Every structure is written in C-alpha cells, then in structure tokens.
From Swiss-Prot:
HAMAP family in alphabetical order: TorD (MF_01150)
SUPFAM superfamilies: TorD-like
Designated name of the protein: Chaperone protein TorD
UniProt lineage: Bacteria, Pseudomonadati, Pseudomonadota, Gammaproteobacteria, Enterobacterales
Function: Involved in the biogenesis of TorA. Acts on TorA before the insertion of the molybdenum cofactor and, as a result, probably favors a conformation of the apoenzyme that is competent for acquiring the cofactor.
GO cellular component: cytoplasm
Length: 210
C-alpha cells in the first residue's frame, strides 16, 4: 500500500485558518457558495488522502452535500451556529476554553505571548475562543517554514496542540449532542481528527508544498 505524504506546513496553516473562520462567525451567502465550491471539494479530497482523516472528511462532505436539500440553507446554518456557539444553556457547545474545567485559566494568553502575538482590538470575543487557538496554529505552521525559528515554533506548536486537546474532545462531543442537522458536528469531528493527527508528529520536519 502506497503511503500518502504528510500534509505540508502551508496546508496545515490554510486548513486551520479556514476552520477558525467557520467556528468564529456564521456562514453568510458568500460563505455558503464557497463551502459548495470545487475549491473546497479539492481541499477536502487532499485531506481525505490521509487515512486518519478520511472518515471525518467523508462525513463533512455528506453534510455539505445535504445543504443543497435544506430550504434557506444559509439561514438554517446561522440558526445552528447561534444555538450551538452563542447560547449559554445546557444544549450548547460554547467555543471557549474557560468553559471547560480541564483547561488551565489564561493558557492562551501565555501561548500568544510566546508566539509574539496578541488579539486584535476588533476581536469582540474572549481571547480563549477556539478561533484564536486555530489562528495561532495557522501562524505557527507558517512560521515552521522559516528554518531559524523551527525548533522554537515546533515546541510552541506542541504546547498549543496539547492545550487545545485538553478541552476540544468535550467541545466536539457537545457539538455531536446538540447539532440536529450535523454540519457543525461533522466540522468539529474533522477539527479534532486534524488536531490529533498534527499532535502525533512530535518531530515535525519541514515539508514543502508542491
């Protein structure tokens, strides 16, 4: 059996940035068109080549295809997003690290400081939002392409992944329980699979995108 090459740093970075956007704000009309585009289909096909990601990608592909069968799909997705990520009742999946007792308080601020980053003043959500973790991982993977920073950035990448994995499984489980149509449940399962896949490469070498 032919072993598929690992994802390139740039590919990880782009996927994390894409997921950060989807978990940060509702999908608008333009975003819905993009979700159903050939470009996204190609990205998912690339991820699907990795056996560890194949099942999660296939599930997300099914949920994206099902959007074409939903009346007012954009409005329905917006309602799903609001119910899952903006409500505070027991049927939500809040995307904040501080909502999960496993996470050390203020960890994301320490990670950002180590990376020389800070949250933009225009960002109106708490700094421990899932999107911030994913943007940080995107930045770190891009930085791994700069050889003089490789060791430091790889160590920080591992710390960020470990911190995220303290609460991401519970977040994903909440999405599974409370997302009736399943798009965000599938998205969270893919995210968890990618983070675990990334975390499994402790001695991450530089892989250039072709």
């Amino acid at each position: 059996m032919i072993k598929q090459p690992a994802l390139a740093q740039e590919q990880y970075a782009c996927v994390y940035a894409w997921l950060a956007l989807l978990f940060f704000r509702e999908v608008d009309d333009e975003g819905l068109i993009q979700l159903q585009s050939a470009e996204i289909a190609d990205w998912l096909a690339l991820l699907k080549r990795q056996p560890a990601l194949a099942a999660s990608v296939a599930l997300l592909e099914q949920k994206i295809a099902a959007l074409s069968l939903r009346q007012d799909a954009q409005l329905e997705l917006a309602a799903d997003f609001c119910g899952l990520f903006l409500m505070t009742d027991k049927k939500s999946a809040l995307p904040y690290a501080s909502q999960y007792p496993q996470q050390e308080p203020g960890m994301i601020k320490h990670l950002l400081l180590e990376a020389g980053m800070e949250v933009n003043d225009d960002f109106k959500e708490p700094a421990d939002h899932l999107a911030i973790y994913l943007e940080l991982l995107s930045h770190l993977h891009f930085s791994l392409g700069e050889s003089f920073q490789q060791r430091r950035m790889n160590k920080l990448r591992q710390k960020t992944l470990s911190s995220l994995l303290e609460w991401l499984p519970e977040f994903t489980n909440n999405c599974l329980k409370h997302d009736p149509y399943g798009f965000y449940a599938a998205l969270s399962q893919l995210l968890l699979a990618i983070v675990r896949f990334d975390d499994g490469k402790e001695d991450l070498s530089i892989v250039a995108a072709e």
